[in-house]
């Protein structure tokens, strides 16, 4: 593993493989249970340390609060573990993921009544936007 530093402080790490990241994340998960407010966000072989209150979901909700946007008007799409916190009806009313999303993301989107696209990557996100397009337009 390679530790990432900013201003001489460790802020994250990169592993050589996803299997190695699985092991590291498992060890870190145990640490989060004993260290107050410590957490992490990860995506494939990349991991970033963070406060337990910080994730894409809380960031999305705070942005909406600051801008006065109701979650009923929010579309959200993601494909990996770091996206799971925002792919809930707590943060957005319209959820989607591309077909290349990891199984946990596809399951979360389905369980929340969102759209799992038949297309991959950005094309899948565009499909999700079109799927929710009628609803989004009716909210305007």
Regions found by a protein language model. Give the residues of each.
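Mg2+-dependent phosphoryl-transfer enzymes with acidic/Ser/Thr/Gly-rich catalytic loops
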Residues: 49-50, 57-140
């Amino acid at each position: 593993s390679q530790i990432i530093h900013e201003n001489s402080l460790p802020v994250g790490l990169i592993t050589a493989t996803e299997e190695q990241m699985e092991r590291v994340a498992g060890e870190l998960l145990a640490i989060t249970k004993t260290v107050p407010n410590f957490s992490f966000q990860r995506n494939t072989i990349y991991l970033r340390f963070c406060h337990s209150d910080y994730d894409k979901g809380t960031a999305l909700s705070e942005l909406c609060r600051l801008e006065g946007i109701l979650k009923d008007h929010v579309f959200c799409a993601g494909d990996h573990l770091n996206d799971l916190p925002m792919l809930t009806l707590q943060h957005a009313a319209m959820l989607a993921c591309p077909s290349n999303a990891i199984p946990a993301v596809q399951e979360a989107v389905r369980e929340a009544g969102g759209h799992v696209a038949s297309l991959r990557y950005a094309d899948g996100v565009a499909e999700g936007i079109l799927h929710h397009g009628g609803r989004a337009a009716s909210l305007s």
